[in-house]
Each structure stands twice: as structure tokens, then as C-alpha cells.
Amino acid sequence: AGMVNICYCLNFPELPLQGNYDDTKYKIYFADSGLLVAMLDEEAQEDLRTSKNLGVYKGALYENVVGEALVKAGYKLYYYKRDDSTLEQDFFVRTASALIPVEVKAKNGTAKSMRTLISSEKYADIHCGIKLTGGNIGYSDDIYTFPYFCAFLLKRYLAGVNI
């Protein structure tokens, strides 16, 4: 009934996305991040509201907000987790000719898995990535950085650039 968004695990990060995922492996995100916050225990809610202390919830909340924005922009949700390593990517979006990993960073840090996906010849459909952080807009080493609140604009941005 539209309460959750399902994010399927890709078998391999390559195009096409449809038919390239395992429907038995998935993550579930709330379709409304406000409901997620409302379901937290009272102490955690108070901590969020009064002291803005996101604590252990920060990564999950930001990932949920970005997943919600991507769905509302018209994307289906996909992630990748390689079984034999620590390689994991939060989301993927696509253009007509490229697959673009999207990383949600709760803290400003390196996106190690994304760098591996971009630099390895095994992932031929991936040429650049998008990192969403609490920081400013930037570009370095084939990674475009945007503030979280720009997630809903990714589709429009990607339509206007040649990636």
C-alpha cells in the first residue's frame, strides 16, 4: 500500500538493471521518512528533536531519505553487495549509456566501494559516481558530490550532462 520502498540487490553492477537483480535479496526503506522517525522509541525521538543528535540512526535515516527521494524522482531502487568482499554500494541510477553508483555518507569520508567500481575494468558501465553528504557541491576523481537535499534533483541533473 505504498508504505515501503524495496531496494533489490543487483547480481552484478551492469546494465540493464531490469532482470539483473535477485528478488530474494533486498532492503526495505520507508516510503515516508517521517514515519521512520515516528517509529523510533520516545528517547531517540526526543534526542533527534531537541539536541539534533542522530547518533547510531544517522546513516540509516539519511539512506532512507535518499532512497525516498530517488523513488519520488522516478527511479527504482537497486544496491550491490559482493558476497566475497566488503564491496557494497547503497544505490544505482542510470543514464541512457551509463550506470552510476550513488553513495550516501553520514560522515564526510571516502567512498571506497565507489572508487573500486569506477576504477576497475570489470565494471564497464560505470564511469563516475555520485556521493551525497552533508557538505557542498564538488567534483574530484570522477565523483560528483552533492548535499543530501539535492537527491531529488539527480534525475534532472543527469539529463542535462553527458555521462
Model segments located where?
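Accessory nucleic acid-recognition modules appended to NTPase machines
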Residues: 1-96
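Catalytic cores of nucleic-acid endonucleases
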Residues: 106-146
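Structural motif
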Residues: 98-102, 128
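Short catalytic-loop micro-motif centered on adjacent basic/acidic residues
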Residues: 79, 101-104
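Domain-level recognition of nuclease-like catalytic cores that cleave nucleotide substrates
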Residues: 135-163
